[in-house]
Amino acid sequence: MKSKMNANINKIVRKFLKNLLVATLITYILFFVIFIFLQKSFIYFPDDQDFKDCQGFLDYEKKTISNTRFYFKQGTDNALIYYHGNAGSTCDRSLIKEFFEENNYSIIFVEYTGYSNDQTKPNKEQIFKDVENIHKFLTKNNLNNNVVYGQSLGSGPASYHASLGNVGKLILVSPFSSMRDLIKSKIKIYPVSIILTEDYNNQDLLSNYNNRLLILHGGEDKQIPVHHSRKLYEGLKNTNKEHIIIENFGHDDIWLSSIFKKSILDELNIKL
């Protein structure tokens, strides 16, 4: 009687474990498929801010060149080009423009296709086309030896811009070595290298960039931990580079740091 009861219990346990394994496998596959088809939704977070109705850039021209939109302020024949992160819009970054205006650079704040109420879905291919259009605009208008600034996701288009040439300085804030590395560190159970289409590989893009490179990163950054920018920094052969870790600041508040402000201003004060 007892052995029969034990056999029934073992049968129930085996059935439970089998069902649990099947459910786990189905869940794994389901989330895998969801990530494949919706990965852009996990990377890009645009808002519906209207590009033309931005109060923060009232004193800038609103330009559109080959479907690439940007805010532009004419200054010297050296330009500073700003590429923002993955959330919100360029309009949100108007608070930081004062850092760049003291040196009378011509200033460009780039808006990505798919952002600021644009109906296109953001994607790497189109964002790189935005970069190419900005690069052509700079060349056409004789804006040379420029400063390129990219923050977070913006380090990808900024690095691509640097790879196209005519960049005297590159400033990267909270960057990663590659999007592939970043996502692998967050989603360890999936073969990201197989399924990721939106890989911004800054390590490769900057392999031949040898001009000035400044990397700033908050020591308390949880979204893109500082070891990602350290890997980028250490993996580049460029000898004209600097990596500054700003302790006690994270991903979204780094720009409030006095060290951040001083580092940016000092960098811009050095003539190209």
Where in this protein do the model-derived segments appear?
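Membrane-embedded segments
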Residues: R69-F137, Q151, S155-G156, Y160
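Acidic catalytic loop of the alpha/beta-hydrolase fold
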Residues: S89, E220-I224, H251-D252
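C-terminal catalytic histidine-bearing segment of alpha/beta-hydrolase fold enzymes
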Residues: K231, N238-L272
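Short alpha-helix in the alpha/beta-hydrolase fold that links the catalytic acid
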Residues: I96, N202, N211, P225-E234
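Short beta-strand/loop motif that positions the catalytic acidic residue
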Residues: Y209, I215-D221
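Hydrolase active-site cap/lid region
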Residues: S155-N211, S258
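An N-terminal hydrophobic leader/cap segment in hydrolases
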Residues: F16, L20-S66
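Alpha/beta-hydrolase fold nucleophile elbow
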Residues: N142-S152
